[in-house]
């Protein structure tokens, strides 16, 4: 639960991050004796580089220092500020979180996996990940064919809140790549044709 101080810090950080084209995704304040800690995760449509994170950190730090001087906030005798990106384990919640990860494979709530194809209003189009069938062992490795799933599923975004991005070490299967880049209306048509 956010405290009044957390809310003030988030508002200050969001104003400064916006100057760099960044959104504040998460803020954690920890009071630890003489040295407190403020950790802020920021993101943008294009992944921020280290220079942009440094610029945001300087702006946010200056805003915090000015607010402390004006006695609007109290971070304790000293504090450490860490500005970073959310990371792959950050749970997707907002439309912008899903939008920034179109084309990436996600671990969905309930245990499924699917590729984020499109986001519009409060809907997300998901291309279900192909499931591997068991196959013969070949040269010490398990061989298997991927069984295609339904071409697309449309979910209310709220049902997918908490999804996380999965690390992939190879490109998406060709069948999934071919289905990326359609409009939400086209994904709705695909979903309807699959139901028939």
UniProtKB/Swiss-Prot annotation:
Coiled-coil parts of chain: none
Keywords in alphabetical order: Cytoplasm, Ribosome biogenesis
Keyword match Transmembrane: no
Protein location: Cytoplasm
Location of the region described as Disordered in the Swiss-Prot/TrEMBL record: 131-153
GO cellular component: cytosol
Pfam families: RimP_N (PF02576)
Example GO BP: ribosomal small subunit assembly
Keyword Cytoplasm belongs to the record: yes
Biased composition (Basic residues): 131-145
Similarity-based family: Belongs to the RimP family.
PANTHER family in the cross-refs: RIBOSOME MATURATION FACTOR RIMP
Function statement: Required for maturation of 30S ribosomal subunits.
Protein name: Ribosome maturation factor RimP
Upper lineage: Bacteria, Bacillati, Actinomycetota, Actinomycetes, Mycobacteriales
Gene that encodes the chain: rimP
